[in-house]
Amino acid sequence: MTIKSLLSDIEREERNVHKAIKDSVKRNDLVTAKALAREIVSSRRTVKRLYENKAQVNSISMHLGESIATAVTVGNLSKSGEVMKLVNSLMKAPEIAVTMQAFSKEMTKTGVIEEFVSDAVDNALDSEDIEEEIEEEVDKVLTAIAGETAAELPEAVRKQKMNVPAQKAETLHGEDAIVEGVDAEEELEAIRYRLANVRS
């Protein structure tokens, strides 16, 4: 699957999630609404990475063209530190990591780049900082999609953690509410599954 088709699939799925969030807010199911908003934040970050990866692939192609031109005139391929840097960066991208591994091995064999060393270190931000940033983005998505309805909800309700199923069960009262909660969970899982397939 190409980067372009991946972006198209993610955008289409996000429109479906928008509707699911609005429906969840209407029935006061903030657990599902916030979980779905988190999925949108994750998808948008994936889209951002895909655009960055696309630009880096184009840059690699440019550097390879220069290396090949050098090989024609000098008789050997130039070892480009810039190409190595870009390849190492793309090796971290889950969307195209497998392709880049094979690509980099072939370039190493032909001498286009030196033996690559993939840096496994993530962003300088620690996980706690990233989590806080994601929570802020989730609240923004909820407000943007659900509008005043979500904005008027108590702060404590909007900030509650969404990843504890037992917590959701405790907030539901009566048999009908429990059945509705199960349906919402199934809907959420189905959407998560589709989003995961798009991003993988």
Curated annotation (Swiss-Prot):
This is Putative vacuolar protein sorting-associated protein 24 homolog 2. Keywords: Coiled coil, Endosome, Protein transport, Transport. One of its GO terms (cellular component) is ESCRT III complex. It comes from Arabidopsis thaliana (Mouse-ear cress). Component of the endosomal sorting required for transport complex III (ESCRT-III), composed at least of VPS2, VPS20, VPS24 and VPS32. The keyword Protein transport applies. Belongs to the SNF7 family. InterPro entries: Snf7_fam (IPR005024). Component of the ESCRT-III complex, which is required for multivesicular bodies (MVBs) formation and sorting of endosomal cargo proteins into MVBs. The ESCRT-III complex is probably involved in the concentration of MVB cargo. GO terms for biological process: protein transport; vacuolar transport. Residues 2-23 form a coiled coil. Pfam families: Snf7. The keyword ATP-binding does not apply. It comes from the Eukaryota. The gene is VPS24-2. It is found in: Endosome.
